């Protein structure tokens, strides 16, 4: 609470100083726009995460439900949260495990390690046994970015736990997206400039069954391009050195050097085509040589931040850090300008954007010592937690609005505040 009281006092002082210099204006104290809210505690973090799992995890299947109204996560059209959001929920479980370990709480550490194992097993069983060539539209893989979000989290899981299956699945899925599937018949997400496709990554293949090759003017979205960079760099950080390059037409692995080169290539294309480098704004997409679609989405800002941080750490080149800072500044100062809180979007699944942002702003703060964002992050947590459903301890996506007790809350919106809490201890 101290930071809000201090801010309010500073604004009050500023208002008095301004008034004293203008005799024609009535001197009056500054009235804060927002009520002061209490600060969350580390104990609140565990309350929030336990509540998220209690109300939104299918405890039988170990995948997450779409909302509290769903009794079970049956399938895509019957209660299961979106396939591309499930890995973010797995990220949250891994962050809970790491947090418990850092706190020296062995009971919680064991509990959340088991949850991590259960979530992988549950998702694998539900999503076609992680057969990335299965393109059924219910429990299969039919959009490139859906696969790539899993590629990223599987690589992070290998980094944390060292389970070879996680690395194998991550690399297999990366190759499936990049090169396409001989079984499905798509030509891959990579828009090879040497084939006249213009560079970057295509978002989808169409039709889903018996697809046509992508063409240069097809959509290249930020949500596939920057996650591809994150995946490539995370794999670069974790695969062994000394590999021999595969000569297969659809390789199941890359060398360390190839992952770095691919990450750099896609990043360069995406920055040139999807980023306003003067502001840090990320466009949603671009089709061919048309103008970028300048629509703000927090998760696009987030994956750009993450890609930039990873390239900065891999190369030491400051341009990448500068890009990450500019993107974070734009997110904090422009996108979040209305309430000085991360915005809420009402589209299906868009509530998860804060949870995606949590992962990458934490990397910028803690891996790159950019601690200037901590007050903003904690402001979001404090408002979201203060306005939770007090009975169920579930948060919504509009952090400035009180949740109606007992109302339906979707897992996407409910994930944001606990995701931030798990990565940002109250006392640091």
Region roles according to the model:
Residues 148, 226-227, 231, 298-310, ...:
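Aromatic- and acid-rich polysaccharide-binding/catalytic face
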Residues 226-227, 231-295, 302, 307, ...:
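Noncatalytic carbohydrate-binding groove/subsite architecture in carbohydrate-active enzymes
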Residues 167, 171-265, 269:
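Aromatic- and glycine-enriched pocket-lining scaffold segments that form the walls
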Residues 30-145, 160, 180, 184-193, ...:
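CBM-like carbohydrate-recognition segments
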Residues 1, 7, 14-39:
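Bacterial Sec-dependent N-terminal signal peptides
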Residues 141-154, 161-164, 169-173, 177, ...:
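Mobile, glycine-rich extracellular loop/lid and propeptide segments
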Residues 86, 147-150, 167, 225, ...:
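Residue-level detector of extended alpha-helical repeat arrays and alpha-solenoid scaffolds
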